[in-house]
Amino acid sequence: MGSSSLSEDYRQCLERELRRGRAGVCGDPSLRAVLWQILVEDFDLHGALQDDALALFTDGLWGRADLAPALQDLARAFELLELAAVHLYLLPWRKEFTTIKTFSGGYVHVLKGVLSEELLTRSFQKMGYVRRDNHRLMVTTPPPACQLVQVALGCFALRLECEILSEVLTQLGTSVLPAEELLRARRASGDVASCVAWLQQRLAQDEEPPPLPPRGTPATYGAPVDLYQDLQEDESSEASLYGEPSPGLDSPPVELAYRPPLWEQSAKLWGSGGQPWEPPADDMHRASSPPYGALEEELEPEPSAFSFLSLRRELSRSGDLAPPESPSSPGQASPRHRQAEAAASSAYGPAVEPLSYQAHSCLSPGNLPTLCCDTCRQLHATHCTALSACRPTHSLRILLGDNQRRLWLQRAQVDNLLYDSPGAHP
């Protein structure tokens, strides 16, 4: 099946859903299954669809320690891009779809956190958007309808590619590996099984992981507003998908305002009901990895000076973000559980002496740790050779951003003074 045939099937799917009162991304299970199978067998279909798959995945996965949540973030971004193209194709008379705010809303929280500004601009240019100023993208001349369908189909294929890569990681049994290795294996394989086998052989040859490349400049994380609408909007108006309380005469009926499943979970991401956006519960479960990749530095404000209060607050918060315990080490309690036990014992009995952490010898002066082993209670650099002994059974924690890394290093230095100095123990 060629790309032209896929485009026609995709167009019919969109128009069929519109007749049913839904104007959203494609959810046809048969088309989904067909496209999945074609993509698994032939990665080069992305080239025929002209969806810039290799550039987008290379950019979106670059520098991510754990690729599983990174792929979920990319899938959300591709769904939002697909929805923008579908809106222009199905509802070209809706003027609010001709302007996208680039300083807030879904653009910041879903797109800019995982993809570079250059690739986002290129993706929106395919839909006819041009940059009007530093805060807006606008459609001045709508592109042909067939081009919008092609762009939306490409984003649909990118979403499925995220699922294919996630399936590879699931069968591989790990999602902590270099992104370039995953993409190289995917392009060289004709099915999921051969891709997994290629990666298993490759990982068996590597004694230590290469250092992670740095992420780009973090995006500002602020309160989201509507992707299309202005900031000056009546908060008491009825909330809708696009911030319009009552459609005009040239707008479709209210029942056509489709909310795709993703946005039903966070309806205020695009709409403007005056309520703050809150991430879904599953996003909180994935908080141990950077939620949008480039937002690491914004998770905590930079302290003006070191203090034990900021150290304690940061370490307690990092315990909340810690991944669950390793099933192979049930006797090792997580820092969060240790803190709860310490609080309980201090209220009803003698306080339990907190565990001390040490900086491993791999950390040269001036370098910050990137990983923390809660089993050995040591801080490591990414390239540390001792990590090969920790990875199979120990509980490893990824330290998010320079602020958290600096505070953990300061904790290790304080622990060294408290527990290793003469007279520290009775």
Swiss-Prot record:
Sections of the chain in a coiled coil: none
Residues with Phosphoserine modification: 318, 326
Superkingdom, taxonomy of origin: Eukaryota
Keywords: Phosphoprotein
Pfam families given in the database record: SPATA2_PUB-like
Region named Disordered: 204-223, 234-256, 269-300, 316-347
Xref: Gene3D superfamilies: 1.20.58.2190
Family (UniProt): Belongs to the SPATA2 family.
Protein name as annotated: Spermatogenesis-associated protein 2-like protein
